[in-house]
C-alpha cells in the first residue's frame, strides 16, 4: 500500500485509497476538471470480499457458492461504494472482456 500511495501522490497527493483492496488496484483514472483518482477492478474487489467472508466463516478456498458471491456483491454495493463518495475518492471499474 505504501508504494501505491507514494506513486499516486505524484498525480494527486489527496487521492484516497480503498483500504483492504490493494490487490484490486489497477491504476489511476482521469476526469475532466478533477484530479486523478485511484482506480480499482470492481470484480477483483468482490473476490477480495469473498476471500474475507470465507476466512470469517472458516471455509476452504475451493468452496464457492452463489449465496456468498451475492453477499459480497450486496456488501460492495451497499457499504463500500457508499464509503467513497467525496472528492478524491477512488473509482471502481468493470473491465471490458474482449
Predicted features, each with a name:
Residues 1-98:
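C-terminal alpha-helical interaction appendages
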Amino acid at each position: 500500500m505504501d508504494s501505491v500511495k507514494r506513486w499516486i501522490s505524484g498525480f494527486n497527493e489527496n487521492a484516497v485509497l480503498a483500504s483492504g483492496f490493494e490487490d484490486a488496484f489497477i491504476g489511476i483514472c482521469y476526469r475532466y476538471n478533477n484530479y486523478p483518482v485511484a482506480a480499482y477492478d470492481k470484480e477483483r474487489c468482490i473476490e477480495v470480499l469473498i476471500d474475507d467472508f470465507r476466512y470469517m466463516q472458516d471455509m476452504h478456498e475451493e468452496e464457492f457458492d452463489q449465496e456468498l458471491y451475492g453477499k459480497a456483491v450486496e456488501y460492495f454495493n451497499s457499504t463500500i461504494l457508499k464509503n467513497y463518495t467525496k472528492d478524491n475518492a477512488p473509482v471502481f471499474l468493470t473491465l471490458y472482456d474482449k
